Amino acid sequence: MIRNLPEGTKAALRVRAARHHHSVEAEARAILTAGLLGEEVPMPVLLAADSGHDIDFEPERLGLIARTPQL
């Protein structure tokens, strides 16, 4: 198994393996094989991965302001 994976990545791998009725090891092999063969990884899988980095959302710095919706 791959060592030092973030806990969120491990959890996502366990969920994906269960969804595909695979062991965690078999799912990891399938992901690596697909990645090396150029198959795209679905966006939800990428978003579920915990990269270990936090992103700060700063609306003011981005120039975003609240607006009243026009109905």
From Swiss-Prot:
Q: What cystine linkages occur within this chain?
A: none
Query: SUPFAM superfamilies, alphabetically?
Result: Ribbon-helix-helix (SSF47598)
Q: Which GO terms describe its biological process?
A: regulation of DNA-templated transcription
Q: Which UniProt keywords apply?
A: Toxin-antitoxin system
What does this protein do, in the record's words?
Putative antitoxin component of a possible type II toxin-antitoxin (TA) system. The cognate toxin is VapB14.
The protein's name is Putative antitoxin VapB14
The source organism is Mycobacterium tuberculosis (strain ATCC 25618 / H37Rv)
